């Protein structure tokens, strides 16, 4: 089940990125600088009043003419409208109501999506009167903030999460397995999906996806019901290349959010890129099941060692997710295509796997006997018992004498024991250590 998406929308220079970065610095946990982290921080995980959601900074493009302002603003707003559950409509309280604000407001009213109107740059109490003219937008009561001074952000977020409570669909689980096909343009995502649809011959329907330029295809098989999310699109180059790349990334991230399993497709003739590492790293960071597919394998000159060598190089570049499954195919010739959905289903089953508490503790007891916990300072870690508290991904809590005694190497050892005994290939696992006083 995907978390709600909150998009910050508005014309250029109203302070969208400043607001996003302020929230990121205050409330959003950004993982350390690894290939799994997007440095531009277009997307970030957020939590307020125990509601978890994903925040998007739609950014603002500096235009060269008034016409470009309007067209780029419209594109930005439309993308955000399509993917968001709640929209923060940001306006500039110092500059006042602008014609472009009215055009954005008109789009938002037509969307019938929940909108929180936020008047930014209200740095002083006396400036609050500047907000009154924005009632003319017909979007509702404005919230006044100063993103630069972090004033009013709590009131704004209170309004945002109120809409989550009204969203009954947020609590519904879809029985279908959502699979996002991600990767660079022309790597063969659409070709593979078309091949899968042609071979399965059980397509329910093709419907426009929730993110622009993506298509959701429904496929039923003997072993599962799947939604295939094609993130292909925007393949042609443009004069505004940076803008298009930015929106392409936003759409891909939205598809990852919706997915249970993320399939990273790599061109066998090109190998893996930094862009590939970043995009699949995001899926890893938010704990999705992962399958890496090397496409166009028919174009590679090979011997009996080529595949192992290629996979070894991939594992070095994707060392932050050693659990990933790999598959070498040719969407063009159909080589191993029949294994794609089967392997994705295996990843999903492991992603959704539960282990009985008794069996779990037997394995951990054996692991402790084979390798005793290290002494940290003057204290040795004692593990009393372990239990699984969740799936997607499998999440375990270890009750111990002192969580400070757990060394990362021993935590990795315990997780590896879980992997070896319960086959968690294709999914990350999470472990947490909590103190329990010895009786």
Swiss-Prot record:
SUPFAM superfamilies: P-loop containing nucleoside triphosphate hydrolases. GO terms for molecular function: ATP hydrolysis activity; GTP binding. The keyword Nucleotide-binding applies. It comes from the Bacteria. Residues 353-437 form the KH-like domain. Gene3D superfamilies: 3.30.300.20, P-loop containing nucleotide triphosphate hydrolases (3.40.50.300). CDD domains: EngA1, EngA2. GTP 1 binds at residues 10-17, 57-61, 120-123. The keyword GTP-binding applies. It holds the Pfam family MMR_HSR1. GO terms for biological process: ribosome biogenesis; tRNA methylation; tRNA wobble uridine modification. GTP 2 binds at residues 183-190, 230-234, 295-298. Keywords: GTP-binding, Nucleotide-binding, Repeat, Ribosome biogenesis. InterPro entries: AAA+_ATPase, G_ENGA, GTP-bd, GTPase_Der, KH_dom-like, KH_dom-like_a/b, P-loop_NTPase, Small_GTP-bd. Residues 4-168, 177-352 form the EngA-type G domain. GO terms for cellular component: cytoplasm; cytosol. GTPase that plays an essential role in the late steps of ribosome biogenesis. Belongs to the TRAFAC class TrmE-Era-EngA-EngB-Septin-like GTPase superfamily. EngA (Der) GTPase family. Associates with the 50S ribosomal subunit. This is GTPase Der.
């Amino acid at each position: 089940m995907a978390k709600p998406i909150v998009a910050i929308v508005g014309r250029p220079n109203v302070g969208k990125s400043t607001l996003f970065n302020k929230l990121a610095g205050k409330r959003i946990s950004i993982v350390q600088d690894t290939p799994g982290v997007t440095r531009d921080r277009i997307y970030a995980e957020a939590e307020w009043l125990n509601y978890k959601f994903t925040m998007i900074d739609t950014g603002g493009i500096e235009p060269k003419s008034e016409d470009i302002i309007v067209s780029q603003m419209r594109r930005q707003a439309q993308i955000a409208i399509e993917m968001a559950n709640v929209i923060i409509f940001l306006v500039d309280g110092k500059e006042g109501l602008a014609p472009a604000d009215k055009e954005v407001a008109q789009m938002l009213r037509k969307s019938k999506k929940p909108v929180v109107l936020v008047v930014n740059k209200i740095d002083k109490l006396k400036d609050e009167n500047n907000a009154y003219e924005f009632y003319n937008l017909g979007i509702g009561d404005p919230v006044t903030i100063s993103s630069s001074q972090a004033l009013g952000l709590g009131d704004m977020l209170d309004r945002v999460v109120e809409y989550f409570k009204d969203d009954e669909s947020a609590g519904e689980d879809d029985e279908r397995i959502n699979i996002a096909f991600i990767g660079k343009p022309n790597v063969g995502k659409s070709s593979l999906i078309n091949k899968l649809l042609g071979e399965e011959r059980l397509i329910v329907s093709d419907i426009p996806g929730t993110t622009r330029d993506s298509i959701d295809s429904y496929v039923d098989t003997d072993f599962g019901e799947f939604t295939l999310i094609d993130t292909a699109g925007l393949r042609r180059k443009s004069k505004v290349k940076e803008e298009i790349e930015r929106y392409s990334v936003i759409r891909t991230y939205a598809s990852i959010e919706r997915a249970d399993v993320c399939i990273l497709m790599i061109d066998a003739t090109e190998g893996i890129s930094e862009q590939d590492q970043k995009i699949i790293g995001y899926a890893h960071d938010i704990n999705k099941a992962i399958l890496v597919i090397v496409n166009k394998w028919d174009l590679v000159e090979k011997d009996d060692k080529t595949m192992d060598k290629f996979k070894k190089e991939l594992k070095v570049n994707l060392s932050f997710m050693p659990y990933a499954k790999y598959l070498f195919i040719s969407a063009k010739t159909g080589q191993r295509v029949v294994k794609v959905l089967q392997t994705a289903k295996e990843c999903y089953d492991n992603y959704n796997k539960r282990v009985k508490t008794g069996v779990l503790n037997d394995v951990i007891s054996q692991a402790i006997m084979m390798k005793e916990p290290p002494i940290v300072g003057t204290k040795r870690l004692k593990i009393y018992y372990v239990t699984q508290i969740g799936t997607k991904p499998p999440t375990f809590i270890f009750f111990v004498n002192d969580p400070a005694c757990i060394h990362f190497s021993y935590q990795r050892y315990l997780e590896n024991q879980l992997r070896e005994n319960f086959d968690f290939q294709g999914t990350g696992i999470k472990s947490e250590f909590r103190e329990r006083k010895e009786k």
